[in-house]
Amino acid sequence: SQSKVFQHIQEATGEIAAVEDLSKYADWRLQVANIPAIITCTDLMAKQHPELVVAYMKGMIRVGRWANEHKRAAAAILNKQTYYLDEDDTYEGIKHVDMVPNLSAQNIAMVNIGKDFMLKQGYIKNNFDVEKWAAPEFLAQAGKELLEGEIAKKKMQKIPTMQGRVG
């Protein structure tokens, strides 16, 4: 088994047979079946409406931040669509996971490993450059716009108001 999730199902139901618990190994590449969730859109959408892609990414960043700050509530939501046994099990599975989308070197490497496997097995027909395909400009722009908005909001909070002044 490549994840604790399937190990739990196997233990609870006996429907899945574990051959090896790869989560015991320190090498993260052995657990690449846990490829990070990939957010995609069509090439046409990216070219014709980049502002919509950036707006969507801003929403995904906000959702990730919320999930990081509210892991129990996030676990309750995610439990409805995962293979975990229950909300507590889901929480244990996500409590150390950063839910904010990112294009870290490790995430790109994990996607590359998954892509190479799917290419070798014939699930995808055309090879491609994962770093270029990831289109980092959308996530970067979304992060920049969110930061600019947060800075502007903080500046506005520091401006004194004239409310309540007499004379």
Whereabouts are the PLM-identified features?
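Pocket-lining segment of extracytoplasmic ligand-binding domains
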Residues: 1-81
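Short, structured secondary-structure boundary patches
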Residues: 20-22, 39-43, 109-111, 142-151
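Conserved C-terminal helix/tail region of periplasmic/extracytoplasmic solute-binding proteins
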Residues: 119-167
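Short secondary-structure boundary/hinge segments and terminal tails
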Residues: 8-10, 27-29, 96-98, 134-138
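Residue-level preference for alpha-helix termini and adjacent loops
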Residues: 38, 44-45, 98, 102, ...
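Short loop/turn and capping residues at structural boundaries
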Residues: 21, 89-91, 129-130
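Secondary-structure end/capping motifs
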Residues: 47-125
